[in-house]
Amino acid sequence: MGCLGNSKTEDQRNEEKAQREANKKIEKQLQKDKQVYRATHRLLLLGAGESGKSTIVKQMRILHVNGFNGEGGEEDPQAARSNSDGEKATKVQDIKNNLKEAIETIVAAMSNLVPPVELANPENQFRVDYILSVMNVPNFDFPPEFYEHAKALWEDEGVRACYERSNEYQLIDCAQYFLDKIDVIKQADYVPSDQDLLRCRVLTSGIFETKFQVDKVNFHMFDVGGQRDERRKWIQCFNDVTAIIFVVASSSYNMVIREDNQTNRLQEALNLFKSIWNNRWLRTISVILFLNKQDLLAEKVLAGKSKIEDYFPEFARYTTPEDATPEPGEDPRVTRAKYFIRDEFLRISTASGDGRHYCYPHFTCAVDTENIRRVFNDCRDIIQRMHLRQYELL
């Protein structure tokens, strides 16, 4: 019996030893995971709808992952290239849908605007009728006549005049870009370029995480939907983020939001920024402000058709600050406009600033890869300092 007792004790000892070793392994892994987690910079992308958040994420993939492939983790270049081509093929449908939505929206708006817009060539009316007849066709297969009608209409001066008034209705930003490329997109062997994929508009619903590495530093970027009904989901992302990147469509000063067709888009962005800046859960998280769509802002300002002071009367009294640094060759009117918009946001951050978090503004053009590369490089030092502060190492 004694031997049996000893044998049982031996089994118990072995089991306890194995358990201790297992616990050690688990503890070691937990410590390792904790170190990786603490070493990761988590960036939360926020902003109103259609400000360019998803385009910023696409640029991170181009710059720091493997472009437009599935996961971005392939070490085999051939596999990465294969995945990239596969994803581009699936995006063709999204691009065609953007093209269809663009021409449909413009021709449908012609009769609804006040005053309405007439076709320059009345013989194109049958083309308008065709476009409107296929507006709600599910799984549309894009026959040759669609491209023929769309191209002829896009060349009609009346349709162009309606496009010029697109701030009076809801039109996707990429409309002109894809309508100008009808002859390319209609080809059976069409493969989208990176620029096509950057321009492609697909509504973001839910929360998407993109992981990438820059100089051996891990970044996790969270992109959430910008429309009002998506915002309640944001709180899930707020836990332990290093910084918020708040994206603004600077060119939206003369537009209204899709949700109610009344609220000014830039005012909506200012209101949202204020609510985030003053949120009690975010009082220690600094904000990197991307004043986006600078290319479209410059176009609008120089066209002179929609004046900022008609929407923001205080612009009439605004003077460009002395410390402004315009881009080479930039028109002074553009410089004044972009700094006015910047200062509207800084007014919010300085009014309620308590020294616990800061706002760092940058002028961006999300579809310009080199611009985003330069801006993100400028931001990395700021993000690093935020990260050190987050874990009280600074």
Swiss-Prot record:
Subcellular localization, as worded in the UniProt entry: Cell membrane
Catalytic activity: GTP + H2O = GDP + phosphate + H(+)
Pfam families found in the cross-reference section: G-alpha
Enzyme Commission identifier(s): 3.6.5.-
One GO CC term, this protein: perinuclear region of cytoplasm
InterPro entries: Gprotein_alpha_S, Gprotein_alpha_su, GproteinA_insert, P-loop_NTPase
Enzyme class: hydrolase
Alphabetical keyword list: Cell membrane, GTP-binding, Hydrolase, Isopeptide bond, Lipoprotein, Magnesium, Membrane, Metal-binding, Nucleotide-binding, Palmitate, Phosphoprotein, Transducer, Ubl conjugation
GO molecular function, one term: adenylate cyclase regulator activity
Domain of life according to the entry: Eukaryota
Residues covalently joined to lipid (S-palmitoyl cysteine): 3
Tissue specificity of this protein: Isoform Gnas-3 is abundant in brain with intermediate levels in skeletal muscle and very low levels in other tissues.
Stretches with biased composition (Basic and acidic residues): 8-23
Membrane topology, record value: Lipid-anchor
Something else known: This protein is produced by a bicistronic gene which also produces the ALEX protein from an overlapping reading frame.
Quaternary structure, from the entry: Heterotrimeric G proteins are composed of 3 units; alpha, beta and gamma. The alpha chain contains the guanine nucleotide binding site. Component of the TAS2R14-GNAS2 complex, consisting of TAS2R14, GNAS2, GNB1 and GNG2; within the complex interacts with TAS2R14; this complex plays a role in the perception of bitterness. Interacts with CRY1; the interaction may block GPCR-mediated regulation of cAMP concentrations. Interacts with ADCY6 and stimulates its adenylyl cyclase activity. Interacts with ADCY2 and ADCY5. Stimulates the ADCY5 adenylyl cyclase activity.
Stated family: Belongs to the G-alpha family. G(s) subfamily.
Protein purpose: Guanine nucleotide-binding proteins (G proteins) function as transducers in numerous signaling pathways controlled by G protein-coupled receptors (GPCRs). The alpha chain contains the guanine nucleotide binding site and alternates between an active, GTP-bound state and an inactive, GDP-bound state. Signaling by an activated GPCR promotes GDP release and GTP binding. The alpha subunit has a low GTPase activity that converts bound GTP to GDP, thereby terminating the signal. Both GDP release and GTP hydrolysis are modulated by numerous regulatory proteins.
Stated name of the protein: Guanine nucleotide-binding protein G(s) subunit alpha isoforms short
Organism: Rattus norvegicus
